[in-house]
Amino acid sequence: MSSMKTQVLYKSRTGNTEMLAKTIFEAIPGNSKDIALLDGQTNYDMADLYFIGFWTDRGTASVEVLDYLGSLEGKKIALFGTCGMGNSPEYYKKLEDNIKVFIEDDNEYLGAYICQGKMPISVRQKYMGMKNAMIQNFDLAMLHPDKEDLQNARVFVKEVFEKIKREA
């Protein structure tokens, strides 16, 4: 496992996913690792294990992330992402399901970590005419990703490596 090359690739629109990506990168054991912004290129340093990060819009990830996921073959893949809406495990599972279908069957899917992320102030202005629950959700999102979210990301990395270790 120590010789396993790990790559963290992410797409971030507002900085939330970037924050998570850096935390996940730091939590990966060893030195055989790299982190890069996913910007549409496909010639990233080839790795054995990929942590692929995304922001969400309308229940899925950006085209760049989905295209890259579809291009990977014979790799171990873990997903991570942020979304402004709801701190809801059910919604996060739906997001995961919507995105993981782009991963080809010859890859080993290792799970996903998704947490709430802060939204642009323009979203709050749009919410002013909506229900109080949406305003409350925005206000809660301003505190995320928080220390607990980042710690949970570290735990997720540990769980991924434990899954790999059990297979060996």
Place the predicted regions along the sequence by residue:
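FMN-binding flavodoxin-like domain, especially the glycine-rich phosphate-binding loop
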Residues: 26-34, 47-52, 56-168
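Basic/polar N-terminal segments that are highly enriched at the extreme N-terminus
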Residues: 1-4, 168
